[in-house]
C-alpha cells in the first residue's frame, strides 16, 4: 500500500481523477494536496506502508514526515539542491537528517542526465560531505530497505 502526495500533479499526472502515470494497483494518489496536510491525511485515512512525495523543505512538511514515521509509515521524498553544501544549509533538511528519519540518500545528477543515480550514501555520511563543487540536482531520501527489493548498495559509480 503506497500513498503519493502529489501537490503539483507531477508524479501521478492525474487527469479527471485518474493517474496517467502507472503507479501500481495498490497506490493512492492525493493530487493537488499541499504536502504537509496530504501526508497527515494519507496516514490517517489510507493506512499506507509507504508515502512518496517530492520537493520537501518547509517546516510543515518536515513535521508531517516526522509524524508519519512516528506512526510506522515509511517515507520516500526528494529535495532539490544544486550542491550538497546548499542542501546542508537548509535548516529543515538538517532537522530531518539529524532526527534519524532517513537512512539513505540517493544523489541524482542533473544537467545532461537528469535522474541518473550518481551516489548512494548513508544519511550519517552527509555531514562529512558537501564542501566541494558537487553538482546534484535532487536528493532522494529513502528511510529503510523495502521487502522484496533488498538493501540498497553503499555506492553506485558513474
Language-model features, listed with the residues they occupy:
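P-loop NTPase switch/communication element
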Residues: 1-42
